[in-house]
Swiss-Prot record:
Miscellaneous note of the record: Function inferred by structural homology with BTV-fold inner capsid family.
Chief location of this protein within or outside the cell: virion
Locations listed in the record: Virion
Keywords: Capsid protein, Inner capsid protein, T=2 icosahedral capsid protein, Virion
Protein name per its UniProtKB record: Inner capsid protein S2
Role summary: Inner capsid protein that self-assembles to form an icosahedral capsid with a T=2 symmetry, which consists of 120 copies of VP2, with channels at each of its five-fold vertices. This capsid constitutes the innermost concentric layer of the viral mature particle.
One Gene Ontology CC term in the entry: viral inner capsid
Keyword 4Fe-4S: no
Entry keyword annotation includes ATP-binding: no
Biased amino acid composition, Basic and acidic residues: 1-10, 19-64
Record note on quaternary structure: Homodecamer; each decamer is made up of two conformers of VP2, called VP2A and VP2B. 12 homodecamers assemble to form an icosahedral capsid.
Segments for region (Disordered): 1-64
Similarity field: Belongs to the turreted BTV-fold inner capsid family.
Length: 1193
């Protein structure tokens, strides 16, 4: 792990070394370097040896790191972030002193009954718990819980034979079991009275739990269809396929498991040794290991069983060479000093689980976070004045931190763009960071301004003006400021609503001009990209204050224009119907477009001709180098952000700055407009003078805005732009009226195939359409801009208000040093890593859905896809996606739900390899896609590690050869009795000589109909030289017949009924050669456990002649003990069916019961196909569940 030391960047000198020509507007000289700064410089020199390096090697790394101030950081401590800044003298008071003792009484009295307006930032109140980790850690520290495994042992105990294990237990072995849970688990599994030990599915050891695919439920793979006729048997097949798909998905959701804290304990065996105990004496055993048969070779009460376990180790056994490949415990892979960081463990889990854990861990090791990468990620999330230095401490903190690849960050951007909740989480963090820095305060200007207006202006006008500013003050807050700045940062994702509440008298509506025009300075993106609303408010105001000028302007230039064929042309549209879609289609208010006016035009349109010069963008772009170095995602190809104005240091700022110049121009234009307006109105001279004074006062007071924007807002935004939190811009400084195209997402290559037929389009989403990404609903009142312009101060404040303007004096500095901590960049780094890991999990969900898509040609999930392809409808696709998202706990189905133009819900998830597109306002994909941003891009779905894991999971889920799927082909129906049965017993069709065979597929003519009144069924055939014909199926004269047929559906229903009546005589059989049987093997411990059934299985085929798949139970009687008087009589199995091939069973060992020293007669052989002793293919000790190659494909 690395520790990080923060210190202030000291490359820039203090301003005391410069000659200042404007002393009256400059702060007092800041004292020379403090002692702390001197110490920091020394630390900086010492840090150069490790800066920009992976870190000191373990060989040379000191245990402690000492700093020059004699403080010591222990090398074993986890990651710490220490931020030290000494930004001198700004903020006399914090925003918490809004209603301090000097103003609170009067101000509260004024604002108590004022109408309040709020600024909302439309983000959802959500927690980062919605972000699902890509890796799932299981910590075994201090716990004896077992390791996860798909399979484990299942013990069948003969309850009718009361042998107590403890009667024969060895006391020394019992003591050893207490220290080694794996030994006690093994003894518990291989009990004295266990008649059978088999393998069972244990998917519940995972989270989420993995269901047993052999349990076929009622849910079908195909939705909303009725199974009738020849397709009726498909219902069972679809339900079986669904159960396997469900298991596949649940296992895929558990691919990335990290096992932590797995301890080992050595075995100490100090009594009579066996072959196994000699090998294991002193061996380290995993404390959390599962049961293993080999432990019973140390000691077992049933001596023959213990001997049998030891016999597998006899010298010369080529299958198992214990001394070379049988391993226990763990091997150290990575070690730091005396600490084991990474180990390779050996445990008795199945090879599939071992493979998935190892492959997931291998990805983590191949892409493990290192100190330099983490430094780049974190450095981007701190202000530029804070420099980062890296020291080497324990690496285990980084050991489990995944380092995202470039492809991961690219897809992360895609998720951020389309997922409103993830965006809201990022936006909420941005707002939190803005508020946490304590950069803004609310000044007392409101109180002074209202007092000034009241003193200098008499009558109702003064009261109305004072009421206006009271409303402005009561509605604004520092949080409202941060809300509007957040909306500005994320304007591309904001559906913004600006309310403009007009006042009781038209004279006061002049203030609305100020509000609207200030918006283009403070939030240029919001103002320009919502110019259909801001322009509408300007239009309404001009309709009042310069109506004749506006009418003449419209007559010459039109109200709306559009750029077509290299020229601006008028658009005939009424203001009342102009909206957002028109703006996106390139239709703009003509007075918002830059144009060159002649002297005659300026004279004719004195106010309107100035509008663009009053709203023209003041700022510029900044390159986001730290973001680029950190590889954080950004939508545009050129990684830069637009600032609303330039950055001017708080030590250099004066009232003569670009923003103040713009504000003064706005004030002058409004004053000029008001003068011309009052010239044509019968207004008292005192009223006009009063308004001149008010406007003059506002104009001078608003000089505060330039200081706020240049020295606080712009630097803060520049810092945030470089962080992970800022991911898209798109503002066009030269043509600000151009709104970036809306964004949507659909299948990759929909753009290229948009001209295909509707049938082809259905394989994507909706042909050439896309789902438009959702936006946040933000709203405010235009008063917020007056509030920001007058009543908010930043790192430089100005509270002096006079009738001639405001001035900055030396008193604006706090004489004491105030330290403003940078916001916690480590929190942003943590959020970034959470988001990218969450997006990687979503990528996995899309990867699986892509494999199921009808357009996919991949081998993975092909059995399911082939079945689905015939029913690839919206409802089936949606049901599948819902199932995937439920299992992965990633509700991405919301990505495919949107409101269409008619406010109705639309949802179609049939998107293959989704990507972003630029789209029209209605969601149609643009015919030309921009090349300067991340649209029409093919993402990487999955990775090499995931694809390899999915191949193994496919083997588990869909390979019918696995013993997990107890499935056999062929079934014989009739009546059978037997006194014993085992899975190896079966009815041999070819070797049977008791029945006369009739192949109905080759000789369907044996059944005919006879008779004139109605008809009868007749069975006729030739046996030897004799002809046989029967119309009575119950006739005892019919020789015992064995019918053979592939599918009963090939026969007439009446013929099938005839055969069924023949079977009821218990003298005939029918062999269904192509029927697939899913079966369970029920092992009986006593005849009391067996209950014969009276049902006839063939009845199911009579009812459904197309039935080709059925589930049945078979019995194993090998381990029945009859040691009670009521069990001494002979017992038999009575069944209406038999298997025609041997059955499979997960039998590990059987017959461990009876007198412990006389159990040879019942002991079965140890199934070596179940076990693999070693770590072939880099896997752990395990038992196999397949007779295929022990090397996982």
């Amino acid at each position: 792990m690395k520790s990080f030391k923060w210190k202030e960047n000291t490359e820039e000198k203090d301003d005391e070394e410069k000659t200042n020509e404007k002393e009256q507007n400059k702060p007092k000289e800041i004292d020379s370097k403090t002692e702390q700064e001197a110490k920091q410089e020394k630390v900086s020199e010492a840090d150069n040896s490790v800066k920009d390096q992976e870190g000191i090697t373990n060989k040379n790394r000191p245990e402690d790191i000492s700093y020059v101030d004699d403080s010591t950081i222990q090398a074993k401590t986890a990651l710490t972030v220490e931020a030290i800044t000494n930004i001198k003298g700004h903020l006399i008071e914090s925003d918490q002193k809004l209603a301090d003792e000097r103003a609170s009484q009067y101000l509260q009295t004024l604002t108590n009954n004022a109408v309040r307006y709020t600024t909302t930032f439309g983000i959802s109140e959500i927690s980062d718990e919605i972000l699902i980790p890509y890796y799932h850690e299981i910590d075994f520290q201090g716990s004896d819980k077992e390791l996860p495994s798909l399979f484990s042992f299942e013990t069948f105990v003969n309850e009718y034979y009361g042998t107590d294990l403890l009667t024969y237990e060895n006391e020394k072995f019992k003591t050893m079991m207490c220290d080694h849970p794996a030994l006690s688990r093994s003894s518990e599994i291989f009990k004295v009275n266990a008649y059978k030990i088999s393998i069972k599915w244990t998917g519940e050891t995972f989270n989420p739990s993995i269901g047993d695919p052999s349990n076929i439920g009622t849910t079908s793979l195909i939705k909303n269809i009725a199974y009738v006729g020849v397709h009726n048997s498909d219902n069972y097949k679809d339900r079986k396929l669904y159960s396997r798909l469900k298991m596949f998905l649940e296992l895929a959701a558990n691919c990335n498991i990290i096992l932590k804290g797995c301890a080992t304990r050595p075995l100490g065996i100090d009594y009579e040794l066996t072959k196994v105990s000699k090998k294991l004496n002193g061996a380290k055993i995993l404390y959390n290991d599962k049961a293993h048969i080999i432990y019973n070779g140390i000691y077992h009460p049933v001596t023959p069983f213990c001997d049998k376990v030891n016999d597998i180790l006899k010298e010369g056994d080529v299958d198992i060479d214990f001394g070379k490949i049988f391993k226990y415990g763990r091997e150290v892979v990575t070690k730091i000093n005396t600490y084991d960081i990474l180990n390779k463990g050996y445990a008795a889990i199945d090879q599939f689980t071992a493979y998935l854990i190892n492959m997931g861990m291998q990805r983590l090791l191949d892409h493990r976070m290192n100190a330099n990468s983490y430094k780049d990620l974190t450095q981007a999330n701190y202000p530029s004045r804070v420099s980062l230095h890296v020291f080497d401490t324990l690496l285990d903190e980084f050991l489990y931190v995944y380092k995202p690849t470039d492809q991961d960050w690219e897809f992360c951007l895609f998720v951020i763009m389309i997922d409103k909740e993830v965006r809201s989480l990022i936006m909420a963090k941005t707002k939190q960071m803005m508020l946490s820095r304590n950069l803004f305060g609310q000044s007392e200007i409101g109180l002074k301004l209202t007092n000034l207006i009241t003193r200098r202006v008499q009558g109702n006008i003064a009261k109305n003006a004072a009421d206006y500013f009271i409303n402005v003050m009561s509605s604004g807050s520092i949080e409202s400021l941060c809300n509007i700045l957040c909306s500005e940062m994320y304007a591309r994702f904001s559906k913004f609503n600006i309310e403009c509440s007009y006042l009781e008298t038209e004279y006061l509506d002049l203030f609305k001009f100020l509000e609207i025009l200030l918006a283009f300075i403070i939030t240029p993106r919001l103002a320009w990209w919502n110019s259909h609303k801001f322009g509408k408010h300007l239009y309404d105001l001009m309709s009042v204050f310069c109506r004749s000028e506006l009418i003449a302007y419209e007559a010459r230039y039109g109200c709306f224009i559009k750029f077509e064929r290299s020229a601006w042309v008028k658009v005939d549209k009424h203001v009342s119907v102009y909206g957002e879609n028109d703006l996106y289609d390139g239709i703009y208010f003509s007075f918002l477009i830059s144009r060159t006016y002649s002297a005659e035009e300026i004279k004719a349109f004195p106010f309107i001709s100035k509008i663009y010069s009053l709203i023209e963008p003041l700022g510029d772009y900044i390159n986001l180098d730290r973001k680029t170095r950190a590889k954080y995602p950004f939508f545009e190809t050129t990684v830069r952000g637009y600032l609303p104005c330039s950055i001017i240091s708080y030590t250099d700022i004066t009232t003569n700055n670009p923003v103040n110049t713009r504000v003064n121009n706005i004030g002058a234009s409004i004053i000029d407009l008001s003068q011309r307006y009052f010239t044509h109105k019968p207004t008292k001279t005192s009223t006009k003078e009063a308004y001149d004074l008010i406007l003059d006062t506002i104009g001078n007071t608003a000089n505060n805005l330039g200081i706020l924007m240049h020295s606080t807002v712009a630097p803060m935004l520049a810092t945030l732009y470089d962080t992970f939190l800022f991911f898209a811009d798109g503002f066009n400084k030269t043509s600000p009226w151009v709104v970036p195209r809306k964004l949507g997402y659909s299948g990759y290559n929909v753009y290229a195939d948009r001209n295909k037929s509707d049938a082809d389009r259905a394989t994507y989403l909706i042909g050439g359409r896309a789902i438009v990404i959702p936006r946040n609903l933000d709203s405010t009142n235009s008063m917020i801009y007056t509030y920001i312009g007058i009543f908010v101060h930043g790192v430089v404040r100005c509270d002096m208000v006079t009738s001639t303007g405001s001035y900055i004096t030396s008193s604006h500095y706090d004489p004491d040093s105030i330290s403003i901590m940078p916001f916690n960049g480590s929190e942003i780094t943590t959020l970034a890593l959470k988001v990218v890991n969450h997006s990687k999990r979503i990528n996995t969900v899309f990867t699986l859905f892509n494999y199921l898509h009808s357009k996919s040609t991949d081998e993975i999930l092909s059995p399911v896809r082939e079945r689905l392809s015939k029913f690839w409808t919206t409802s089936n696709a949606r049901a599948l996606l819902n199932e995937i998202t439920r299992i992965f706990n990633c509700p991405i189905e919301r990505y495919f739900t949107q409101m269409n133009a008619y406010d109705t819900m639309h949802s179609d998830p049939r998107v293959y390899k989704p990507t972003l597109y630029s789209v029209s306002s209605t969601g149609n994909i643009d015919s030309v896609q921009p090349a300067n941003c991340a649209v029409n891009k093919q993402y990487e779905f999955g990775d090499t590690y995931l694809n390899e894991m999915l191949k193994v999971i496919s083997h588990v889920a869909f390979d019918d050869e696995l013993p997990l799927f107890r499935q056999t082909e062929g079934l014989v129906c009739g009546y059978f009795t037997s006194s014993s049965n085992s899975p190896d017993d079966y009815f041999s069709v070819d070797e049977d000589t008791l029945y006369f065979s009739i192949d109905l597929d080759e000789h369907p003519e044996v059944f005919t109909t006879v008779g004139t009144n109605g008809f009868s069924i007749q069975l006729q055939f030739k046996k030897g030289n004799d002809d046989h014909a029967y119309t009575n199926p119950m006739s005892k004269d019919i020789p015992s017949i064995k019918f053979l047929i592939n599918r009963i559906g090939n026969l007439n229903a009446h013929f099938v009924q005839f055969i069924n009546r023949m079977l009821s005589t218990q003298r005939h059989l029918i062999v269904l050669r192509k029927v697939v049987v899913d079966y369970n093997v029920i092992t009986l411990g006593s005849w009391n456990d067996y209950t014969p059934t009276s049902s006839n299985v063939f009845d199911q085929f009579v009812k459904d002649r197309d039935l080709i798949n059925i589930k049945l139970d078979f019995y194993d009687t090998r381990f029945i003990i009859q040691n009670q008087s009521n069990q001494l009589l002979s017992q038999y199995l009575f069944e209406s069916y038999r298997n025609i091939t041997p059955l499979k069973d997960f039998v590990v060992m059987g017959g461990i019961f009876g007198n412990p020293n006389r159990a040879e007669s019942k002991l079965t052989d140890i199934n070596k196909d179940i076990y693999c002793f070693g770590d072939d293919n880099d896997q752990t000790t395990k038992y196999f569940t397949s007779k295929k190659s022990k090397r996982v494909v």
